[in-house]
Amino acid sequence: MATYAIVKTGGKQYKVAVGDVVKVEKLESEPGAKVSLPVALVVDGAAVTSDADALAKVAVTGEVLEHVKGPKIRIHKFKNKTGYHKRQGHRQQLTVLKVTGIK
């Protein structure tokens, strides 16, 4: 089994391994910058580590590749019989990360 980790960022959790490219909520880092992500769980073969003291020694590092926008979602509000309707769109800001190491 390969080594992988569960990292927390932007209020979500992602399963990552070395070499993975993932889209996460926007980070305030420039493209090319190195970032470290907080770890929730590490699986190394058959050994599963979830103890907070052991995870404090583990670091998942990555490199910011670019900042992109997610797909457009459309919001539509409507109230019956009053003629009220409102349309709105939203595109979430995302950061593309390449995981460079789990140590």
Curated annotation (Swiss-Prot):
GO biological processes: translation
GO cellular component, one term: ribonucleoprotein complex
Keyword Thylakoid part of the UniProt annotation: no
GO molecular function: rRNA binding; structural constituent of ribosome
Keyword Transmembrane in annotation: no
SUPFAM superfamilies with a match to the protein in the record: L21p-like (SSF141091)
Keywords: Ribonucleoprotein, Ribosomal protein, RNA-binding, rRNA-binding
One Pfam family it belongs to: Ribosomal_L21p
Protein function: This protein binds to 23S rRNA in the presence of protein L20.
Subunit composition and interactions: Part of the 50S ribosomal subunit. Contacts protein L20.
NCBIfam families: L21
Family affiliation: Belongs to the bacterial ribosomal protein bL21 family.
Name of protein: Large ribosomal subunit protein bL21
Lineage of the species this protein comes from: Bacteria, Bacillati, Actinomycetota, Actinomycetes, Mycobacteriales
Gene of this entry: rplU
